């Protein structure tokens, strides 16, 4: 009897696990995204993109997790700040809070720097017909983003992914009618920049053109991180015309677009200009590397790399159903309105969190910030910094318990940088010569001083 019960339980558990495993982990919608919160984030741990999926203007915003304002902290700032602490204590003991408040300004340093957006790609469609049958999804199981729609009787399908092994944001546009892809590509940025175009062929199946965008973070260019991004386009059929800062595609059946980037960030204690990384050469190397692979090969390499981490963890909850009738947005609304629960959403929520951390935390010394790695804003909320009193820790709660411990390595490296700068903060601001400290805000440069 007991053996029968065990076998039955094993059968039920196996069935539940197989059922949960077969449920696709997808966010899906039937309209394009209009603003940041409705975009679909993809990332390779350093380079990321926000995909909005517009049918007339498909906007894609690029980010690099190492692209911040500023330069390394001056460790000798406010060397005598700790001398004000006895006066502050005295004012507090005397209940002279106004005086204490004014004195504490002497033990505040500069605020953290800003995490900034990199560049924005606009793909303007020449087909002005109304789009119908729109669908877009973010497939968490394979880290692929896709949208599809019909315009003028033509079915268009677009796919996007961010590859860690090949350091690229990749996109493919397909039409089910020959020569139906006609669009204009433009690359711009909110930070100081210049764009130039180049063309390697005038026509044919191997048409190829590129846009190169070079710029720097907001501020003095001699004290700022610089970047170089290269966008390349190759078509199947049709013609490509590169002009000024745009690429015009006419009469293609398929178009593949790649974006690579490099910055001059070379470490928290290295000046981004005088000691910066050779970002122009690195971007060029990243771009040339792609000629070794077809789009499908890059896609396969990306999926294999991602799933080697993602597939380690499975969450099985009862009564989970993948809803093909209600969009993810509608399901969430119904869930919060208590119109019937679906444990699928809870499973999706957990796996989406894992997806985001895998997508934004694979750069040594640079952990996920308040934005993860995705921001459309020139001045990110709360500077997009590292709020170490809770938010930074929250980002990494799932790293080990959800079986992806290597995602925490950038955080470990960052803590070592905080310790290096923090011993000067402990000495200068608190008169402590043994040990180190960090205040509640930090940035790419491992700032540790207190601020107001």
Regions found by a protein language model. Name each.
Residues 1-22:
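Bacterial Sec-dependent N-terminal signal peptides
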Residues 21-452:
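Aromatic-residue-lined binding/catalytic grooves and analogous aromatic/hydrophobic interfacial grooves
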